[in-house]
A protein has these predicted regions:
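A short, exposed loop/beta-hairpin motif centered on an aromatic-Gly-Thr core
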Residues: 171-183
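Short, cationic Gly/His-enriched loop motifs
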Residues: 1-5, 10-22, 88-169
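Polar, enzyme-active/binding microenvironments
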Residues: 151, 180, 203
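Short, surface-exposed linear segments at secondary-structure transitions and domain or protein termini
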Residues: 56-65, 103-110, 181-191
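Short, mixed charged/polar active-site loops
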Residues: 46-49, 91-95, 172-174
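Short arginine-rich
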Residues: 192-205
Length: 205
């Protein structure tokens, strides 16, 4: 059964020293799949929807800010669900993301990673706390300036070879070079090395 709703009532609550008005978000409850979908507002653009576990619905809807398609991630061509919160101590607004609310506070140097790389899938089963490096390796696209067509494979002008290079323990490591006519082999090798060094955080080819 699908249930449709809207939290359009005005709610004034205390957030630190900052008073905020909650404008609300449309939502859909899918009881059969035990999920809910929250509409993300976008200025003058079509809305997007984010998926959460049904047991997180009250937490998300009762949060004192409206959820928007807040930040674009070019690596996955999609938007994070979030809001902008004004902090008087900094005299500026800072982003706060829905996945942070769902998972809770992370330790220093930690990030929340979307396992399937769908950043609008905020079900707890799709979220995990990782290091900054692990979060960076779990990606779907090669760098925008990549000419080889393969992740972690680039042309080295000096040696005139295809170079396989990965970030390992925070450092860029040159692993192996391949001749000009061995590009496909270089791509296969790069994929194997990602699996070796990154494991479940290797991302897509």
């Amino acid at each position: 059964m699908l249930v449709y709703g809207n939290t359009d009532e005005k709610v004034k609550i205390q957030w630190g020293d900052n008073l905020a008005n909650k404008k609300g978000n449309n939502y859909i409850i899918d009881e059969e799949n035990n999920i809910a979908k929250i509409e993300l507002r976008r200025r003058r653009k079509e809305s997007l929807w984010v998926t959460i576990d049904l047991d997180d619905l009250d937490k998300v809807l009762n949060f004192p800010y409206t959820w928007f398609a807040l930040k674009y991630n070019s690596a996955v061509d999609d938007y994070y669900a979030g809001c902008s919160i004004y902090h008087p101590e900094y005299k500026q607004s800072r982003p706060y993301y829905m996945h942070q609310l769902i998972i809770g506070k992370q330790g220093e140097g930690k990030r929340i990673d979307h396992i399937n790389r769908d950043i609008r899938d905020n079900r707890k089963a799709n979220l995990r706390v990782v290091t900054i490096i692990q979060n960076a390796t779990n990606r779907t696209k090669k760098n925008s300036n990549n000419k080889s067509g393969y992740r972690n494979v680039s042309w080295n002008k000096s040696s005139k070879t295809w170079m396989v290079q990965l970030q390992i323990d925070g450092k860029n490591v040159r692993l192996k070079d391949f001749p000009y006519d061995k590009l496909d082999e270089a791509g296969e090798y790069a994929e194997k090395m990602r699996q070796k060094y990154y494991g479940e955080y290797a991302g897509d080819t």
